[in-house]
Swiss-Prot record:
One of its GO terms (cellular component) is cytoplasm. Constitutive repression of the RicR regulon by a 'copper-blind' RicR results in extreme copper sensitivity in vitro and attenuation of virulence in mice. InterPro entries: Metal_Tscrpt_repr, Metal_Tscrpt_repr_sf. Under low copper conditions, represses the expression of lpqS, Rv2963, mymT, socA, socB, mmcO and its own expression. In the presence of copper, RicR dissociates from DNA, leading to the expression of the target genes. Members of the RicR regulon are important for copper resistance during infections and full virulence in a mouse model of infection. This is Copper-sensing transcriptional repressor RicR. Coiled coil: none annotated. Belongs to the CsoR family. The keyword Ribonucleoprotein does not apply. It comes from Mycobacterium tuberculosis (strain ATCC 25618 / H37Rv). Cu cation binds at C38, H63, C67. GO terms for molecular function: DNA-binding transcription repressor activity; metal ion binding; transcription cis-regulatory region binding.
């Protein structure tokens, strides 16, 4: 049996937020098709970017407090792997 991910209790909330983002992205595509004003399109892109960043940061927080904490408590090579994995995820988020 595999262990539950840290976000499992919030899965419905994340799915709802991501469906909202999906709708926003479709709206942006429609704006482009309809030749909407550039700044209006950019404003919507900024909103989507912020929404995705919020989801990513919440997922990262749950990963750190659940998956990484559990691996560190258990010790061994799994802990080092989880720490390296978290560090790489943070680096990707900072670069984006």
């Amino acid at each position: 049996m595999t262990a539950a991910h840290g976000y499992t209790q919030q899965k419905d909330n994340y799915a709802k937020r991501l469906r909202r983002v999906e709708g926003q992205v479709r709206g942006i595509a429609r704006m482009i098709e309809e030749d909407k004003y550039c700044i209006d399109v950019l404003t919507q892109i900024s909103a989507v970017t912020s929404a995705l960043r919020s989801v990513a940061l919440n997922l990262l927080d749950e990963h750190l407090s659940h998956c990484v904490t559990r691996a560190v408590a258990e010790g061994g090579p799994g802990a080092d792997g989880k720490l390296a994995e978290a560090s790489a995820a943070i680096a990707r988020l900072v670069r984006s």
